[in-house]
């Protein structure tokens, strides 16, 4: 067996990011051939990925990317097994590259992203194979849990990631794409992340759901001995409370709890003569 130099081991480590001992073994197994050693490590990563496929990957990061025109964005969740790995440069850099590649290529799902090449930074590997390689490098199960692509025609897209990258959101608004509108959109994205709305406006709440909730409230009120003549008023009050908690436009604004989100949009329209409408939002929380 040929003698493996420390220089060759370092070169392989620089190329793959894998530990020194694993690089030494790969070169030993490959007779000192650098390309074969890289392939050996990739195969080892694939084998480890298969071995770890059933393991739980509940840590990771949420990444949001918005293009320079502020009309297109990507939000994704990439998982690993431990917070230690999730905070490392290798993992976060990998997640960032996937997000940027998805944004550049207008990829709209995690499934489609698996077949997309990550370019020279990852030796041209498709995401599916790069995940296996990264699994071998980091020693943990890696998975692209979900990914969404958002585009606005004539409006804007903005995002927010909470410090720690465990929570993020992306919103799409119509009505304008000024610098002031972008600032507002970012605040709305922060609102979505912090206040966990489930719909934009009350008209988006399914009628059958409202009827179901009304019946639950009715039965609760009657069970508590409330007079029949007051039950309808109680139901109305509880529904209003529900809307204030779950409907984005009716929530208290995170920057001013005395103002509703809808009021903020209305005031913006008056100030800048630019009607702004929130069309949609997506919120990712790690593991949720």
Curated annotation (Swiss-Prot):
Please give the CDD domains that the UniProt record associates with this protein. Answer: UBA_EF-Ts (cd14275)
- What pairs make up the disulfide bonds? none
Record carries keyword Cytoplasm: yes
Q: Which UniProt keywords apply?
A: Cytoplasm, Elongation factor, Protein biosynthesis
Question: Where can this protein be found?
Answer: Cytoplasm
Primary residence: cytoplasm
The annotated region (Involved in Mg(2+) ion dislocation from EF-Tu) lies at: 82-85
Query: Which Gene Ontology cellular-component terms appear in the entry?
Result: cytoplasm
Q: Does the keyword Iron apply?
A: no
Q: Which GO terms describe its molecular function?
A: translation elongation factor activity
The cross-references to Pfam families, in alphabetical order and at most eight, read:
EF_TS (PF00889)
The family annotation for this protein states: Belongs to the EF-Ts family.
Role summary: Associates with the EF-Tu.GDP complex and induces the exchange of GDP to GTP. It remains bound to the aminoacyl-tRNA.EF-Tu.GTP complex up to the GTP hydrolysis stage on the ribosome.
Looking up NCBIfam families in the UniProt record yields: tsf (TIGR00116)
According to UniProt, the name of this protein is Elongation factor Ts
Q: Give the species.
A: Chlorobium phaeobacteroides (strain BS1)
Its ancestry begins with: Bacteria, Pseudomonadati, Chlorobiota, Chlorobiia, Chlorobiales
């Amino acid at each position: 067996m040929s003698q493996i130099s420390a220089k060759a081991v370092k070169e392989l480590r620089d190329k793959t990011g894998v530990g020194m001992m694993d690089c030494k073994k790969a070169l030993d197994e490959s007779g000192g051939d650098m390309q074969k050693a890289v392939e050996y490590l990739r195969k080892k990563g694939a084998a480890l990925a298969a071995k770890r496929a059933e393991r739980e990957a509940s840590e990771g990061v949420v990444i949001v990317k918005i293009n320079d025109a502020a009309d297109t964005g990507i939000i994704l969740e990439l998982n690993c097994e431990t917070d230690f790995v999730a905070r490392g440069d290798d993992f976060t850099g990998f997640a960032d590259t996937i997000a940027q590649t998805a944004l550049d290529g207008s990829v709209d799902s995690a499934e489609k992203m698996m077949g997309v090449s990550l370019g020279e930074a990852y030796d041209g590997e498709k995401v599916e194979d790069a995940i296996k390689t990264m699994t071998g490098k980091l020693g943990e199960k890696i998975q692209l849990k979900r990914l969404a692509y958002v585009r606005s025609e004539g409006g804007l897209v903005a995002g927010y990631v909470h410090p720690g990258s465990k929570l993020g959101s992306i919103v799409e608004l119509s009505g304008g794409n000024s610098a002031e509108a972008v600032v507002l959109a970012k605040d709305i994205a922060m609102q979505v992340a912090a206040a966990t709305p489930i719909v934009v406006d009350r008209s988006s709440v399914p009628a059958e759901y409202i009827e179901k909730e009304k019946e639950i409230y009715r039965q609760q009120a009657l069970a508590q001995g409330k007079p029949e003549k007051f039950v309808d008023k109680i139901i109305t009050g509880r529904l209003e409370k529900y809307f204030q908690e779950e409907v984005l436009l009716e929530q208290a604004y995170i920057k001013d709890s005395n103002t509703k989100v809808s009021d903020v949009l209305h005031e913006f329209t008056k100030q800048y003569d630019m009607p702004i409408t929130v069309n949609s939002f997506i919120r990712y929380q790690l593991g949720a």
